[in-house]
């Protein structure tokens, strides 16, 4: 009987350690698996300073909220579309993000920021185009002359690299020669409002993405697990990170820094030097042509 009671007590203690629970200060604790994101760590600090009812702690073992949501079936996540509709409204989420994440009318991950590395082409060569088809790219590439590259790249698993093991091989010289070849596309980062503003004003490169595909991007998302004991509180945190109050934390990070909300994005863009109505329209055309990388 004593063993049975001890086992039951251990089970109850284990269950008590999972999911949302009261903190010593009376606030409900919500657990976040931030997937190693320093940006979200700073957002947690700001949220905890602002919230009187909830406190978020980082916990990978028994989370209520997860970043990314990879590895979780939709049946294990909360459909947050009703919360979106009664909150910021689905029309505020940038269409390409909503389209890429929506599943049969349900939304299991809220996009909070987006951006990333892409490929850009000279605005002069593009001559007003926003994207490049494969045929257009090949035509422009031919005009750059013999030996021109579509874009400079480097790989460690292709046969020609085997000469790196030859005594006479001079990697530095070969790399210098390789990267001095003319190329149609160059690496370009569009991951912050400042970088987007530069591109639509006086930037030399325009993000076309890969020819025939167009510009693609990554995004940072937050999901609520179905096992969460306080979905309302978890949604309060998601809304905080999505909204402008998390800006001081988000803008200190790297990677996905562009707001997922249209109102916030274009308001921030309009604050940048040199961005007029024409530049804003150009930015809208660019964002409307974006797609979410690896979207299901």
Task: Please state what every model-predicted region is.
Residues 174-248:
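Extracytoplasmic/periplasmic substrate-binding proteins
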Residues 102-185, 196, 226-232:
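Helix-loop-helix "hinge/cap" segment bordering the ligand-binding cleft or interdomain interface
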Residues 45-53, 85, 102, 122, ...:
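Sec-exported extracytoplasmic/periplasmic mature domains
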Residues 69-118:
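Hinge/lid segment of periplasmic solute-binding proteins
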Residues 18, 220-295:
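Mature extracytoplasmic/periplasmic domains
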Residues 40-44, 48, 77, 98, ...:
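Extracytoplasmic/secreted envelope proteins and their assembly/folding machinery
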Residues 2-10:
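Sec-dependent signal peptide recognition
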Residues 1, 13-70:
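Conserved N-terminal structural module of periplasmic/extracytoplasmic solute-binding proteins
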């Amino acid at each position: 009987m004593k063993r049975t009671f001890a086992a039951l007590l251990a089970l109850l203690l284990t269950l008590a350690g999972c999911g949302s629970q009261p903190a010593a200060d009376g606030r409900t604790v919500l657990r976040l698996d931030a997937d190693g994101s320093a940006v979200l760590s700073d957002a947690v600090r700001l949220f905890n300073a602002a919230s009187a009812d909830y406190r978020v702690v980082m916990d990978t073992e028994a989370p209520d909220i997860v970043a990314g949501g990879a590895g979780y079936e939709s049946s294990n996540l909360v459909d947050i579309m009703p919360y979106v509709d009664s909150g910021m409204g689905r029309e505020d989420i940038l269409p390409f993000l909503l389209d890429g994440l929506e599943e049969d009318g349900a939304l299991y991950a809220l996009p909070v920021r987006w951006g990333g590395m892409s490929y850009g082409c000279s605005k002069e060569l593009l001559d007003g185009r926003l994207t490049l088809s494969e045929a257009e790219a090949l035509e422009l590439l031919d005009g750059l002359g013999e030996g021109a590259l579509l874009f400079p790249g480097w790989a460690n698993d292709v046969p020609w690299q085997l000469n790196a093991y030859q005594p006479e091989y001079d990697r530095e010289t070969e790399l210098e020669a390789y990267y001095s070849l003319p190329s149609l596309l160059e690496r370009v980062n569009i991951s912050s409002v400042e970088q987007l503003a530069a591109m639509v004003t006086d930037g030399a490169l325009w993000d076309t993405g890969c020819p025939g595909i167009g510009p693609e991007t990554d995004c940072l998302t937050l999901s609520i697990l179905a096992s969460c004991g306080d979905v309302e509180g978890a949604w309060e945190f998601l809304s905080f990170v999505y909204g402008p109050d998390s800006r001081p934390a988000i803008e200190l990070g790297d990677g996905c820094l562009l707001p997922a909300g249209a109102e916030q994005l274009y308001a921030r863009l309009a604050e940048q030097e040199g961005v007029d109505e024409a530049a804003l329209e150009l930015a809208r055309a660019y964002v409307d042509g974006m797609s979410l990388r690896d979207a299901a």
